[in-house]
Amino acid sequence: MSVSAKQVKELRDATGVGMMDCKEALQETDGDFDEAVSLLRKKGQEVADDRAAVEADEGLVVTAVSDDGHAGAIVEINCETDFVARNEDFQSFADTAAERVLEETPDDLEALESLPYEDDVTIEEELVALTGRIGEKLTIRRFDVLESEEGQIISYVHPGSKLGVLVEVHGDGEAEETGRDVAMQVAALEPIAVTRDEVPDEVKEEEREVAREAAVNEGKPEHVIDNIVEGKLERFFEDHVLMEQAFVKDSSVSVKDMLDDADLSVARFTRYALGD
């Protein structure tokens, strides 16, 4: 069957699929637009099924923050190659998915995939269709949402969109600029907790065990080993606890000192590095 360029363009605009694939779909369905859309979705699912066992360890980390700053979402979406991670359609999908997560705060990935993407299409359906168009395995790996009635959610995404951070900031100071500094600190230095009290007991105990074993192996006197262990634990806190880290923009002060001067505090943070 002969199909017009107008029909092909309409199907292309509706699905984003390549012109030749749209033409073939219309020919196979005798020019029926709805049937052609359904056929293209089916082919997209076939591609997704074929690629299911393939590793997808490239992708993007994206964030979205509400207009009032009281909520933020962070999402990691994976693909097979960095080339696709730079694809405009893939990036647009990732940004839209983050916006939907922010709006709907789903409980899990299954609920996220059931959210509306646009019109009558769900996020899962759009992901399958995009898989068909791009030809790579695409997956939504994880997401998180921070909400705060009193605080501000500040986001930072490192250039390249492989690393992103959300930080919840409280206080009367200038939250936007300082919060971004803190988010960049979290991105760069990978703290595991805001304060030392939040470090899990098993982590502290493991650090003590490692320090004690090292001291014994070095032949340190028994009566000084406890002090050595606690000293190394203090240094561990300085390296891995946000409030005790040296501020990256001024290493002469700690992050806590910087925040105190700014009349701000940090309640929590979320850090996503691609593939972690």
From Swiss-Prot:
Highest taxon listed in the record's lineage: Bacteria
Any one Gene Ontology molecular-function term assigned to this protein's record: translation elongation factor activity
InterPro entries (UniProt xref): EF-Ts_dimer_sf (IPR036402), Transl_elong_EFTs/EF1B (IPR001816), Transl_elong_EFTs/EF1B_dimer (IPR014039), Transl_elong_Ts_CS (IPR018101), UBA-like_sf (IPR009060)
Q: Which residues lie within the region annotated Involved in Mg(2+) ion dislocation from EF-Tu?
A: 81-84
List GO terms (cellular component aspect).
Answer: cytoplasm
Q: Does the keyword Protein biosynthesis apply?
A: yes
Assigned keywords, A-Z: Cytoplasm, Elongation factor, Protein biosynthesis
Give its localization: Cytoplasm
- Name the family: Belongs to the EF-Ts family.
**Cited function:** Associates with the EF-Tu.GDP complex and induces the exchange of GDP to GTP. It remains bound to the aminoacyl-tRNA.EF-Tu.GTP complex up to the GTP hydrolysis stage on the ribosome.
Q: What is this protein called?
A: Elongation factor Ts
